[in-house]
Amino acid sequence: MSRIKGCITIGILIISWCLMFWITGSRTPWQTFSSSDRGDEVSVFLGDIPSENYDRMGFTKGLIEYIDNENAWLVGTDRGELFLFDNDGKQIWKRSLGIGKLVSMCVSHDEKIAFIGEQSPSGNLYAIDIAGGDILWKFAAANVVGAEPAKRSYPSIVHICIDQNDNVYANAYRFVTAKDGSRGYNGKAVAFNKNGDQLWQFPQNENIDSWINWCDVNDNNGKVVLSTSAYEIRPDMKYRDTMYLINKETGQLINSVDVLPVAPFENTVMRGSPNFSANGEFLAASCSDGRGLLFDGSGKVLWQRELSKPTQIDDAWINASGRDGFAVDAGVPFTTINTFNRENWQLPTPVEHPSNNSMFVFNYDGTFKYKYKALGTMEQIDFSGNIAACAVGRNVRTHNYAAHGAVVIDLNDGAELNFFHTDGPLQAVAISTNGRNVAGIEAPAVTPDGKIIGAYKLHIWHR
């Protein structure tokens, strides 16, 4: 009899696991709804995802925004799921948006609508009701940049920004790799009002034959700026310039800016910038070649600074790529990421570049204020007044796992106010409006010795 009872118990457990796996898609479904509270920190498991190689170029992502009206955190995942969590880590609602990865997010000024971009066979842009998670409207990037699933060429809404009227400006993009290793690029900037009515697209009758990763908009100067970031410039490419300034009302090109490259690079690449100052008078950008630039609102260079000079050591060109550029009240911050070998990022480098994984802050007249150096890549930065919260992720050269976590910096002088460690690399960060709470998304990783560190988690820290 006891053997029969044991078999029944095991059978019930197996059926329960199968049911929970069907509902959650997680091999450890009991963790999907779990959270832990460690004093001033709350962590929530976001579900199973593949643990990626620590040293690979592309890596697990996550999206997070603070919703002041709800005192809550809007979280998007690589599993295609969108959550709203309160400040104690309690799930308010969850929405599964599709089969793709969520890759971009922006929230309306009244905090009623979230605009979410995904990478998938459709590449949808979603408008989501923040109160309940309902889909208000959607637009498929595949309609403007196409899709080639057989070649694993999927469209994405790679970046989103909004103006003061909550008009939405989105970069739709996909690339395809040919048999000879060359890349084909398809990009389009698309504008909508908050109800989903399309206002314009740029270019009107063709695609941008370059990688477009970033855009920003400003109401005071009436412009949208796009930056390009193609790996190489081919003779037959039409959209070869670095930045394109567009009339935000009509979608017509105002002017374009070609930022000349520095040796040994053949073109200038901007991936996490440029961004306008609030008054629209300035535009800050960081380049992959290691330069930080400040432009005026028309795209004229006011000054440039060498953050990370490409250096040749033992026949290898190494540099610390620049990525982010901002124009905020406290100054003009730029960031650099890991040290890379110019010939091939997968190749080792003789040394770390001394300017890697750093934030450089300048005054608007170009004078240097300070440098803050992290021990890993600053994956994302969010601001609350003159405080910056930074997600510190991987260092693919030193494998210093103690570097992972969220750091809070005083932008006035670069003082480190807080550091919250995570086991795995922190890939996204946000800070509350009052600066008292910080949240981040940790990702798992497989180390070179085969060990899995970290997990796909939301962390909420109370400062």
Regions found by a protein language model. Give the residues of each.
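Sec-dependent N-terminal signal peptides of Gram-positive bacterial secreted proteins and lipoproteins
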Residues: 12-20
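Generic N-terminal amphipathic/basic segments
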Residues: 3-5, 17, 57
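N-terminal Sec-pathway targeting helices
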Residues: 1-13
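Secretory-pathway ectodomains
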Residues: 22-463
